[in-house]
């Protein structure tokens, strides 16, 4: 682990320590990994509600005349599919079709788009957009201007309603409100596969919102949850994590994120390369693996058909919901691997039998 003094620190670290959190480095930040234990936090989120501090996530603002039009010419998804008050999953690609980052774009109005990239990639996204921005459009890095608090799980709406926060909104919609004189953006978004919300209060006022949420979450039978549970939850959903399922060398098509590309748009970063890859077909595809026997899968393991290597795992964990080892893996398309087929994974010299499945591993309940 990196020296804590060399890492960036969130606005709520003292509160997490008071709650007994254990910490680890993630994206250059010192973040809470668990409190009562990853499995307990995972199950609380699936069955009741979990509260996550994900303030390490980036924030950026694109503002100026035609800001939405500019962002639409740069990021992959088509902003014309949504409008003010809605959010959209999208990607910032390089010219070879690899992924600089995946992020959420919040459509404020035609002249203002708010972005939430991943922690480690915020500067790269801002730099890419600044380099292409037309006169009159500014791109600002607001990484430490806002905290991000995720309330996720079947009782998440009850938690927000208890506090008088807006909860009755469509998936991927958002609303700007005020809570105890603190401005808060409440978004119907998340990274767990459950009905949930992400709240963005100002960095310096995050404690007021966190304390109220923590009390309401506890009252609803939930608990604080760390990045360990966030990872097991997103892996069960098959959601990509940049640096694992997406990277400058892993394209959206390979990661099965082609749905987040506006193919009919005239311009976006990496368009020519991605159109060529779409025409030829990706050389590898992201698939799910579920262990047949006992054990845990991790990233970086070789996947084989017989004695022939056909791919590599990109993420792996033990699924608390399924009580089985699961993984995401990039599999060569010319290996002609099919869903339901058995493959083996080399787990430190042991051949582990796995079934190929199409994620998500458990039912999606976001809506």
Curated annotation (Swiss-Prot):
EC code: 2.1.2.10
Keywords for this protein: Aminotransferase, Transferase
Enzyme class: transferase
Subunit structure: The glycine cleavage system is composed of four proteins: P, T, L and H.
Coiled coil, from the record: none
Signal peptide range in chain numbering: none
Entry keyword Transferase: yes
InterPro entries with a match to the protein in the record: GCS_T, GCS_T_bac, GCST_C, GCV_T_N, GcvT/YgfZ/DmdA, GcvT/YgfZ_C, TrmE/GcvT_dom1
Protein name: Aminomethyltransferase
Organism annotation: Mycobacterium avium (strain 104)
GO biological process, alphabetically ordered: glycine decarboxylation via glycine cleavage system
Family statement drawn from the similarity comment of this UniProt entry: Belongs to the GcvT family.
CC annotations in GO: cytosol; glycine cleavage complex
Chemical reaction(s) catalysed: N(6)-[(R)-S(8)-aminomethyldihydrolipoyl]-L-lysyl-[protein] + (6S)-5,6,7,8-tetrahydrofolate = N(6)-[(R)-dihydrolipoyl]-L-lysyl-[protein] + (6R)-5,10-methylene-5,6,7,8-tetrahydrofolate + NH4(+)
Pfam families according to UniProt: GCV_T, GCV_T_C
Gene for this chain: gcvT
Free-text function comment from the UniProt entry: The glycine cleavage system catalyzes the degradation of glycine.
Domain of life: Bacteria
Entry GO MF terms: aminomethyltransferase activity; transaminase activity
